[in-house]
Amino acid sequence: MEQKQKKIFGNNLSTWMESKDFIIAMRRGLLLCIPFFIIGSFCVLLTSFPVAVYQEWIREVCNGMVYQAILWVYHASMGSVTLFVILTVSHSYASQVEEEDTGFYMLTSLVSYMIFVQSGIEGISYTVFEATWMFTGILITIISCVVFRTVKSAYKHHIKNKYQAGVDVDFQNTVEAILPITCVIFMWAVLRLLLALLGVETDIQNIGSGLLTKLFGVIGTGAVGAALFLFLSQISWFFGIHGSDMLHVVSTELFEKGLTDSIAAGVSAPIFSKTFFDVFALIGGSGSTLCLLAAICLRNNKKDRTLFKAGIVPALFNINEIVLFGLPVVLNPIMIIPFVLVPLVQTAVAAISIFIGLVPPASVQVGWTTPILFSGYLSTGSIAGSILQAVLFIIGTTIYFPFLEMSDAHSAQMLQNNVEKLKEEMIACEKKGEIINLKKGSKVKRETVKTLTRDLKEAITAGEIKTFYQPQITSKNTVYGVEALLRWIHPEAGFMYPPMVIELARQNHLLDDFGIMLIERAAQDLEHLSKRGKPLHMAVNILPVQFESDTFCDRVEAILAKYHFGGCTMCFEITEQMALATSGVVPERMLRLKKNGIVFHMDDFGMGHSSMQYLQDNEFEAVKLDGSLVKHVLDNERCQTIIAGIYQM
């Protein structure tokens, strides 16, 4: 596979970030929370659907119990997102750095967070698990996990010779975890005590909100203030901070208050207001993610199709957490650029349009869940507002498009690098005569294998595996036959190393379908060749798991009944290693298929008593010698003698 280092904007930063355990853990932890984001998003949609008749009905049906039940689901899903993030990020970090004790990481992080966020003697309020506390939760979780791992590693090294053989493993792990857990918990307890003595608030996001309110009180709500407001609210998502919540006080007490004061005074509404941002700068939610979804749809990339399907309906109502954490935007140095840029450009275009009189100002407050086009008309009282939204939508989609290309190119490059490492590991195992275990190793390796396995399964189902034929030439330079080969060209990783594809299929229970697909394609093409009057020999490699399958012979016989080969021959090549490793059912099933016209060859035949005995007890039409035997046949008399002996057998 050709490896080319593409010049991609943000590539170095992205590569560095993807090499850090804590950043990988944050991303994967947030991904694990997506089902709860989806459930919570639909609950918000059900309770905030911007139709007055519906709102009256949902609050009155069953005496309001349906509405209450929806709120219960919301509070248990989206309303508890910080709790989920603490557990999933700590679990992901533990899985990234070691394969055991993930529970200790999770519980230690949760207890540390609960200690840090307590206030006074009242204990813990459930509100500390809402989205506004998510950044604080992630920060405490990462620090707790890193400290826990550091202390545990040092402590484990210190006591490694103090345990005797036979000690229960779970008990030993628990004892080893006591000191690290204690250190982490008391570290946060001491820090919380110091902050309490200093009178410092523990919610980092709230601290930032207070400082920003004072800042905007000085800057004002003009063009500079509006640009800074949007920049800060969008860039904060890169760090996992809910930008809209962090600047909620600024948007309501400054920008929205300016609109209500103008309406009350009977003067012209200001250009910039909370309604202006919701209608013209945040189409589909933060970052104008409806534009992002449109760009994804237009590119028709299979990889992003699931994200589009899951995110499009909520985004129509400006609910976009699914997209923010699914793409993701969080900790993504490539996608954060258009995420910030699109709202700023849309704000500039909308402000100029209002300033020169093309569109009336957004002087009527509308619900933030009101869909595009409707919100433009209702807020301005003019169809011009809807037309402006459509123009801004096109502009935003256009800006997102090239950044999606960059992001995909970077993802493809990372996958290529990981696949190349996997290939190198497999080749090293082959040289040692070992079989690679694809399900063990680093987290990156296991995730790469999961990705390739999923893609291979889809490729088999969709018939995307290519069939190639390698000619077999006689000593007289004539074509004796062909060997059927399946080759997988991955859409991102490129040409896949064939033995690695076989191992992926074998270790993930895909080999039966993979092998039968090759046999059927070979049979179909052999029938075409026979009709052209070419009596060729078609060879197909067979692996152990296929012969061990109880349905293998039935499926092969069904294929043989479907196609007719005339003077051509279908041959199954069985490797010597496979023949010696399989159970006693193999000869019986070989005989069954021989009666149906299948010819058997032994492939990669070597030496040894077991090999010779197997050759003696089974009827093979031909033997393909292993390369180690024929490599020196011209200049080594012993090799010549051995091969002559095999020929006589």
Which residue ranges define each predicted feature?
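The catalytic core of metal-dependent phosphodiesterases that act on cyclic dinucleotides
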Residues: I559-V633, Y647-M649
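Signature for phosphate-centric chemistry
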Residues: H490, V501, L526, V540, ...
